[in-house]
């Protein structure tokens, strides 16, 4: 079992980050993968939507993957099925700027989380970033 971030203080610290890349961000209002990043965007976070099937979300162009994101990223928030987390973590590990990986509700991959932790970064699994922001920050 990995030592994912669970304390309120650790989660609050991650939520103090400025730039969040959202892998699997949706352009469809009403979907959690759109509404959660929209909530974060409205609260001043620099949200970088990542989705190979969208051209523009929140008024910005959408890169296909983390590999092609030129901006610095603090946190990678994952809205993809658990079986895709490992590939996303591979992209995270190619970057020096990401301090944490956050998987949304229902998304968990212990092996991928262990790799993130071994690289010296933090992991939050199976938690909604919007819910935690409302609970701890808003």
Language-model features, listed with the residues they occupy:
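A short helix->loop->beta-strand "cap" motif at the edges of active sites that frequently abuts
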Residues: 45, 96-99, 119-121
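Haloarchaeal acidic low-complexity proteome signature biased toward cell-envelope/secretome components but also
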Residues: 1-15, 138
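NAD(P)-binding Rossmann-fold cofactor-contacting core
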Residues: 21, 26-30, 37-58
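Rossmann-fold NAD(P)-binding glycine/threonine-rich loop
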Residues: 105-137
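Phosphate-coordination loops involved in phosphoryl transfer and adenosine-cofactor binding
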Residues: 16-17, 73
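Conserved SAM-binding strand-loop segment of SAM-dependent methyltransferases
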Residues: 60-65
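Mid-chain, well-packed structural core segment of small domains
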Residues: 66-106
């Amino acid at each position: 079992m990995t030592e994912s971030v669970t304390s309120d203080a650790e989660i609050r610290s991650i939520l103090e980050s400025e730039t969040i890349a959202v892998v699997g961000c949706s352009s469809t209002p009403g979907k959690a993968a759109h509404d959660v990043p929209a909530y974060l965007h409205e609260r001043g976070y620099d949200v970088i939507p990542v989705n190979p099937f969208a051209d523009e979300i929140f008024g910005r162009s959408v890169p296909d993957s983390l590999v092609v994101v030129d901006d610095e990223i603090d946190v990678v928030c994952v809205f993809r099925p658990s079986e895709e987390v490992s590939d996303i973590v591979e992209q995270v590990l190619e970057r020096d700027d990401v301090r944490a990986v956050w998987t949304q509700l229902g998304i968990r991959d212990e092996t991928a989380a262990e790799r993130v932790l071994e690289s010296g970064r933090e992991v939050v699994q199976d938690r909604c970033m919007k819910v935690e922001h409302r609970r701890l920050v808003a």
